[in-house]
Amino acid sequence: MLRRASFVEVDTSSLRHNFHAAKNAIPKDAHIMAVVKANAYGVGALKASEVFLQEGAHYLGVATLDEALELRSCFPKTPILILGYSPNSNAQMLIDNNLTAMIFSLEQAGVFSQAALKSQKHLKVHLKIDTGMHRLGLEPNFKSIEMIKKIRALNGLEVEGIFTHLSNANANIKTHAKNQMKIFNAFLEQLLDQKIEFQYRHAYNSAGILSLCNNNENRFLNLYRPGIMLYGFYPSNEMKQSCQTILNNVVSLKAKIVQIKRVKKGEFVGYGKHFYTNEETLIGTLALGYADGLVRDLGNRIQVAINNQLAPLIGKVCMDQCFVKLDGIEAKEGDEVILFGDKSTKANDANEIAMLLNTIPYETISTLSKRLERVYV
């Protein structure tokens, strides 16, 4: 039974479909690291991970220690890589929970090594290489090769993998992504010349998987990191238009009408006088607000779906509630409202909401609050 009159509905069959879309795009002998950071982009990390592991995911990828620990409590043996930076103070937690850390410095490798030796355990690490995003990672040069040799020589560490991240693979012109892969491949070849090999080599995110798997750029890769595509969205609108792969909608934001009232002409609805009743108006209140992830500025800007009818969202969205105009709409208290979801319901999807807000669907769905229950269908 729902504890609130608002929730996120998650289509698990679509999660499975999208996972296999990723699986079918990569080489048959390669593995998938399902990226489930940010609560699986708002879908719910535990359930999404369960689905992906059932369908054959080999690894899980997160951004933070807390995300990794949440998963470890339910999946005691699954490999979990923390893709983001792990402070030195997290070393013992990483070791005790058999997590895999990303590193890019000899200094941190030394700290992790000492902690592992003290615990009489070992810590798996993946080396991050910066091939052109200029965010985190070692530069792909001779100095880094010498550093990698020193890191590999440290006791207590298992240098399991090496990876980079593509910054612009969702563009129509793939020059930058291909240059990044050219740099990464050249660096891997230099390492091979020094007899330095890694169990896992990865670079492709959703954009790389959807657009760069038919070339030679991925010849060294054996692990792939789908993220946004697992949740039903293409990395860009340009890719949506050109991509042959079909992705299915996963996420719907829903709420129930908790009260309907008739407001007389000449009144303001909600905070700040942002909706004025030019005539007697039927108003429905929903128990859903910006603290749940429904952006405040969507008031007076979108229509929502109620019983296969479209009704305007009016006024400014409040922290915990919002309003719909119900004149001419067949609706009653307790009826379900779709704020965004599958296009077949007549509602906007999260990508359309993102475009309206000049952002991306990653943000629209990953900011859905944990105080919203996830309902899996």
Curated annotation (Swiss-Prot):
The keyword Isomerase appears for this protein: yes
Lineage: superkingdom: Bacteria
InterPro entries to which the protein is assigned, alphabetical: Ala_racemase, Ala_racemase/Decarboxylase_C, Ala_racemase_C, Ala_racemase_N, PLP-binding_barrel
Record key words, sorted: Isomerase, Pyridoxal phosphate
Gene Ontology MF term list: alanine racemase activity; pyridoxal phosphate binding
Record has Isomerase as a keyword: yes
Cellular component terms per the entry's GO annotation: cytosol
Reaction equations catalysed: L-alanine = D-alanine
Cofactors named for this entry: pyridoxal 5'-phosphate
Active site (record annotation): K37 (proton acceptor), Y271 (proton acceptor)
Pfam families (alphabetical): Ala_racemase_C, Ala_racemase_N
GO BP annotations, alphabetical order: D-alanine biosynthetic process
Pathway(s) annotated for this protein in UniProt: Amino-acid biosynthesis; D-alanine biosynthesis; D-alanine from L-alanine: step 1/1
Positions with a binding annotation for substrate: R135, M319
Enzyme Commission (EC) number: 5.1.1.1
Gene3D superfamilies cross-referenced by the UniProt entry: Alanine racemase, Lyase, Ornithine Decarboxylase, Chain A, domain 1
In-chain residues carrying the UniProt-annotated modification N6-(pyridoxal phosphate)lysine: K37
SMART domains xrefs: Ala_racemase_C (SM01005)
PANTHER family tied to this protein: ALANINE RACEMASE, ALANINE RACEMASE, CATABOLIC-RELATED
Family: Belongs to the alanine racemase family.
Role noted for this protein: Catalyzes the interconversion of L-alanine and D-alanine. May also act on other amino acids.
Name of the protein in its database record: Alanine racemase
Organism: Helicobacter acinonychis (strain Sheeba)
